[in-house]
Amino acid sequence: MIKQRTLKRIVQATGVGLHTGKKVTLTLRPAPANTGVIYRRTDLNPPVDFPADAKSVRDTMLCTCLVNEHDVRISTVEHLNAALAGLGIDNIVIEVDAPEIPIMDGSAAPFVYLLLDAGIEELNSAKKFVRIKETVRVEDGDKWAEFRPYNGFTLDFTIDFNHPAIDSSTQRYAMNFSADAFMRQISRARTFGFMRDIEYLQSRGLCLGGSFDCAIVVDDYRVLNEDGLRFEDEFVRHKMLDAIGDLFMCGHNIIGAFTAYKSGHALNNKLLQAVLAKQEAWEYVTFQDDAELPLAFKAPSTVLA
């Protein structure tokens, strides 16, 4: 059978919190089968757990956070969640000694590196996928996102930013998902923001960790980072990274075709909730062997080495 995945060993890293600008220690721990993805704040006494769940997601101006029934939150989970989706990690406990996951370089690549460093282990339980059975679409003005049935996982994302630094030819990106494709084409794409927004937020004591080290920063005319872009179309690739993380908030890789126009965290989450709320639109599936498994989810040699 196709088995659930966790980590082989505990790994730790430090980074800076986007909101506070303070040092954050991140610890990734293996977890038994059927645990799911658990985010944990150890700065609270007793520690508070936040299971990844589409209904717990709140989108703020700066990030995605998970909120529990007592209105306690853990922030900036989206890029780590994308790395978990990319490598198909089903069970993990993610601990931080702060209210937020460190921003690292603004992409998912440092988290991918950390997960690969921990090593990935298969557990003796069947991996559950969410398979899309009916088309589901959500809209917000001219923005929209939809899932259609498809035996694999494809993503097709279009942005519409009217900015001199973002060429019109680089506003759409489509890919057949796989762990290899995610690592090579998506994981290194960084988040982006306007210099004026960062300066305004910092003047109000917010976004204190925001810098050229953790984002693509633009003014009204150009990219301000000395090293420029990692990809010509890094902006839309990062929006796809965000979507991969947002859609993994159900704790399972999804089998279906995702298409979006000008979508963001809130609309991605609205789509995921709309799918899960419509019983006939999806089902859980497991696979007995590699031959049945959609190509998108075959483990690359780098993951299960």
Swiss-Prot record:
GO cellular component: membrane
Keyword tags: Hydrolase, Lipid A biosynthesis, Lipid biosynthesis, Lipid metabolism, Metal-binding, Zinc
Known catalytic reactions: a UDP-3-O-[(3R)-3-hydroxyacyl]-N-acetyl-alpha-D-glucosamine + H2O = a UDP-3-O-[(3R)-3-hydroxyacyl]-alpha-D-glucosamine + acetate
Origin species: Escherichia fergusonii (strain ATCC 35469 / DSM 13698 / CCUG 18766 / IAM 14443 / JCM 21226 / LMG 7866 / NBRC 102419 / NCTC 12128 / CDC 0568-73)
GO molecular function terms listed in the Swiss-Prot or TrEMBL record: metal ion binding; UDP-3-O-acyl-N-acetylglucosamine deacetylase activity
PANTHER family the record matches: UDP-3-O-ACYL-N-ACETYLGLUCOSAMINE DEACETYLASE 1, MITOCHONDRIAL-RELATED
The name this protein goes by in its record: UDP-3-O-acyl-N-acetylglucosamine deacetylase
Keyword match Magnesium: no
Family designation: Belongs to the LpxC family.
Binding site for Zn(2+): 79, 238, 242
Pathway(s) per entry: Glycolipid biosynthesis; lipid IV(A) biosynthesis; lipid IV(A) from (3R)-3-hydroxytetradecanoyl-[acyl-carrier-protein] and UDP-N-acetyl-alpha-D-glucosamine: step 2/6
Gene: lpxC
HAMAP family: LpxC
InterPro entries to which the protein is assigned, alphabetical: Ribosomal_Su5_D2-typ_SF, UDP-acyl_GlcNac_deAcase, UDP-acyl_GlcNac_deAcase_C, UDP-acyl_N-AcGlcN_deAcase_N
Function field: Catalyzes the hydrolysis of UDP-3-O-myristoyl-N-acetylglucosamine to form UDP-3-O-myristoylglucosamine and acetate, the committed step in lipid A biosynthesis.
Enzyme's top EC category: hydrolase
Example of a GO biological process term: lipid A biosynthetic process
Enzyme Commission no: 3.5.1.108
